[in-house]
Amino acid sequence: MSWQTYVDDHLMCEIEGTNNHLTAAAILGVDGSVWAQSANFPQFKPDEISAVVKEFDEAGTLAPTGLHLGGTKYMVIQGEAGQVIRGKKGPGGICVKKTGQALIFGIYDEPVTPGQCNMIVERLGDYLVEQGM
């Protein structure tokens, strides 16, 4: 299965019981290389990804500045140190799950809820961890 298939079928899929989808999603290598992304995933800067990776290594580094992706600033609200970063901006937000080799990004807006985005992103991330990725 290609990485694009994971993005299209597992991240940008219809959310169970609703007719809703994430706004954008991507799978990147921890080096910042794009493995696959949805058509509308924001054009990001390498230093934005470096800051996300640093947060996974040293939890709390993004709290003062926020998580920036494609020029959009998300307030970091919670997460699981070394595994998940969650951020909020207005009615939407972002969830980033780290596996051994990849970063999985999900971006959402209403009517998608933070919990729905977290479930989609973290479910794929947990699967990839189980597969040794």
Curated annotation (Swiss-Prot):
Domain of life, per lineage = Eukaryota
What keywords would UniProt list here? Answer: Actin-binding, Allergen, Cytoplasm, Cytoskeleton, Disulfide bond
Tissue specificity comment: Expressed in pollen.
Q: Tell me the InterPro entries matching this sequence.
A: PFN, PFN_euk, PFN_sf, Profilin_CS
Q: Name one Pfam family in it.
A: Profilin
Family indicated by similarity: Belongs to the profilin family.
Oligomer and partners = Occurs in many kinds of cells as a complex with monomeric actin in a 1:1 ratio.
Q: What is this protein called?
A: Profilin Sal k 4.0101
